[in-house]
Curated annotation (Swiss-Prot):
It comes from Gloeobacter violaceus (strain ATCC 29082 / PCC 7421). This is Protein nucleotidyltransferase YdiU. It catalyses: L-seryl-[protein] + ATP = 3-O-(5'-adenylyl)-L-seryl-[protein] + diphosphate; L-threonyl-[protein] + ATP = 3-O-(5'-adenylyl)-L-threonyl-[protein] + diphosphate; L-tyrosyl-[protein] + ATP = O-(5'-adenylyl)-L-tyrosyl-[protein] + diphosphate; L-histidyl-[protein] + UTP = N(tele)-(5'-uridylyl)-L-histidyl-[protein] + diphosphate. The lineage of its organism: Bacteria, Bacillati, Cyanobacteriota, Cyanophyceae, Gloeobacterales. Mg(2+) binds at N266, D275. Its cofactor is Mg(2+); Mn(2+). The gene is ydiU. Nucleotidyltransferase involved in the post-translational modification of proteins. It can catalyze the addition of adenosine monophosphate (AMP) or uridine monophosphate (UMP) to a protein, resulting in modifications known as AMPylation and UMPylation.
Length: 483
C-alpha cells in the first residue's frame, strides 16, 4: 500500500489536524451551507491513502500514519462542525430544487504548495438535511471506483479532484443497483472547489441577487484572483470559466472518458472533473456510448459531452445574469466552440504523433481518424497503441508502407492513410524524429476499462484481496511507455 501502514502511529500531534485550515467558504455565512456532524462508524480500515496529495499539501508521507488518517478522516475527531453545502441543479435537463450535500460535507480548506486553495470534501460521511431519505453512506465499491477514476485521470493529464483517503467503515448497505448487502466506506477527496453551477442556481431560485454577488466575489477572490478589482471582473470570470470548461471537455474526449452524470450540480466553478459515479472509459470508439444504465436517451453519452458542457454553461447564465449583463455572458459563451476545437485538435494530434499541423491539415487528419475509428468499430485505445508500436519514419516517403492499425473499413482506412501520409510529408526531418516519441508519450498502455475495475472489485469482494487494487493504481500512475 502506498506509503505503507504504521499501526503504531500516535494520534497525538496529528499532521492532518495541524494543517493550516482556512475558513474561506465558512466565512460566507450560513446562507450557503448547513452545519452537520459526521456519522459514527463501527470500524475503520484504511484502504487507500493519497501520498501524492500529502506532498502537495506540504506533508511528508512518512510522518503521517494509518491512525492519523483514521482519526482525522474516519472518526472525524478534532474538527467540526462541518459544512453541508447547499445547491440545486438541472438533472437530465429537469430542474431539481431538492439537492445539496446529501452524504458528504466540506471538511476544510487548505492551501497547497502551489498556492491554490484545496477543499477537503467527504463522501459517505453520514446524513445531512439533504439526504432525502438516503442513509448518507458510500458503498466500498463506489469508493474504490472513485479512487481509480481520480488516479487514472490525474496521471492522464486531466484536471480532476484527487482522492486523499478511503476508509472502510464496517457497515452493511443495501442498494438497488448492486448486489446487497454490500460493504461501506468513507472517502475524502481534494478539489480546487466544491462550488458548483448549481450553487448559483439555488440562489437564483430564491431570487437572492445579493447572495449571488457575494458568492461571485468569493469565487473571483479565491479562484480567479488575477482579476482583482477589475471593473469587468464578473464577465472576465465567466469567459475564463467557459474556456476552462471547454478545455476540460476536450481532455475527457481525447482520453476516451465518459463522466456519465453531467448535471449542473456536478459541474465545478473551477472547471474540474469530480464526483465519479457510473463513469467509464470507452473501449470501442462509439460517440453514442452511455456509461449510466439510467441514461435512457443518451443525454450524457460520450459524444454529447462537449455539447452538454456548453448547455450547462448557458444555464449558468440565468443566475449570473442577475449581476452580469447578458450581452457579456453571451460574448463569453461564444468562445466555447473555438476553444474546445483548438484543445481537442491539439490533444488528438499529439496522440497521432504530431504538434501543430496548420489550420487545415490538422483538423482534416483528426476528422479522418475519427471517421476511420467509427467505421471500423475499432478499439479506441488499441488503435493508438498499434500506431505507436508500428510507426516507422519510412512512412514519410511511402504511403503504401503505412499499415492498418485496426481491422475493417478499408475505404475509411485508405482515406485515413492518405491524410496521415500528407501530415508526415509536411514535417521537417527534425519534426519527423519526434513523431515516435509523441506517440508513446501521449497514448497510454494502461487504460481503466470496466473489466479491470470489475476484476479488482471481485478480488476485494470475494477474498478481501487488495493487492490487485494497489497493483492497478501503480500502473495507472505510469500509464505511458515514456514518462
Amino acid at each position: 500500500m502506498e506509503g505503507g501502514l504504521d499501526t503504531d502511529a500516535s494520534v497525538h500531534n496529528n499532521p492532518l489536524l495541524q494543517l493550516d485550515y482556512e475558513p474561506a467558504f465558512a466565512s460566507l455565512g450560513d446562507d450557503y451551507y448547513d452545519l452537520v456532524a459526521a456519522a459514527p462508524f463501527p470500524e475503520h480500515r484504511l484502504r487507500f491513502r493519497g501520498d501524492g496529495v500529502l506532498r502537495l499539501l506540504g506533508l511528508d508521507p512518512a510522518t503521517v500514519g494509518e491512525e492519523h488518517f483514521i482519526e482525522a478522516f474516519g472518526r472525524f475527531a478534532g474538527r467540526g462542525p462541518f459544512l453541508a453545502m447547499r445547491y440545486h441543479g438541472y438533472q437530465f435537463g429537469e430542474y431539481n430544487p431538492y439537492l445539496g450535500d446529501g452524504r458528504g460535507f466540506l471538511y476544510g480548506q487548505v492551501r497547497g504548495l502551489d498556492g491554490e486553495l484545496y477543499d477537503f470534501g467527504t463522501k459517505g460521511s453520514g446524513t445531512t438535511p439533504y439526504s432525502r431519505g438516503g442513509d448518507g453512506r458510500l458503498t466500498l465499491k463506489g469508493g474504490v471506483r472513485e479512487v481509480l477514476a481520480s488516479e487514472a485521470l490525474h496521471h492522464l493529464g486531466v484536471r480532476t479532484s484527487r482522492s486523499l483517503s478511503l476508509i472502510e467503515t464496517g457497515e452493511a448497505l443495501w442498494r438497488g443497483d448492486e448486489p446487497s448487502p454490500t460493504r461501506s466506506a468513507v472517502l475524502v477527496r481534494t478539489s480546487r472547489s466544491h462550488v458548483r453551477f448549481g450553487t448559483f442556481e439555488r440562489l437564483h431560485h430564491f431570487k437572492r441577487k445579493d447572495l449571488i454577488q457575494k458568492l461571485l466575489d468569493y469565487v473571483i477572490a479565491v479562484y480567479y484572483p488575477h482579476y482583482g478589482a477589475e471593473p469587468e471582473r464578473y464577465a472576465l470570470f465567466y469567459r475564463e470559466l467557459v474556456g476552462r470548461t471547454a478545455e476540460l471537455a476536450a481532455q475527457w474526449m481525447a482520453v476516451g472518458f465518459t463522466h456519465a452524470v453531467l448535471n449542473t450540480d456536478n459541474m465545478s466553478i473551477t472547471a474540474e472533473s469530480f464526483d465519479y459515479g457510473p463513469y467509464a472509459f470507452i473501449d470501442r470508439f462509439d460517440p453514442g456510448f452511455t456509461a449510466a444504465y439510467f441514461d435512457h436517451y443518451g443525454r450524457y453519452s460520450y459524444g454529447n459531452q462537449p455539447l452538454v458542457c456548453r448547455i450547462n454553461l448557458e444555464a449558468l447564465q440565468l443566475p449570473l445574469s442577475m449581476v452580469i449583463p447578458i450581452a457579456d455572458l453571451e460574448a463569453g459563451l461564444a468562445i466555447f466552440d473555438t476553444h474546445y476545437a483548438a484543445h481537442y485538435t491539439a490533444r488528438m494530434l499529439a496522440k497521432l504523433g504530431f504538434g501543430a499541423l496548420g489550420p487545415v491539415l490538422g483538423p482534416e487528419l483528426v476528422k479522418a481518424t475519427l471517421n476511420y475509428l467509427e467505421a471500423a468499430q475499432a478499439g479506441y485505445h488499441g488503435f493508438f497503441q498499434a500506431l505507436a508500436a508500428s510507426f516507422d519514419r519510412s512512412w514519410q516517403s511511402d504511403q503504401g508502407a503505412i499499415p492498418a492499425p485496426v481491422v475493417g473499413a478499408p475505404e475509411a482506412f485508405e482515406l485515413w492513410r492518405e491524410s496521415y501520409f500528407r501530415a508526415l510529408a509536411s514535417l521537417s526531418d527534425s519534426e519527423l524524429l519526434r513523431v515516435g516519441e509523441r506517440l508513446n508519450r501521449h497514448n497510454p498502455t494502461t487504460v481503466l476499462l470496466r473489466p479491470a475495475i470489475e476484476a479488482v472489485w471481485a478480488a476485494i469482494d470475494q477474498n478481501d484481496d487488495w493487492q490487485p487494487f494497489y497493483d492497478l493504481i501503480g500502473r495507472l500512475r505510469k500509464p505511458y511507455a515514456i514518462a
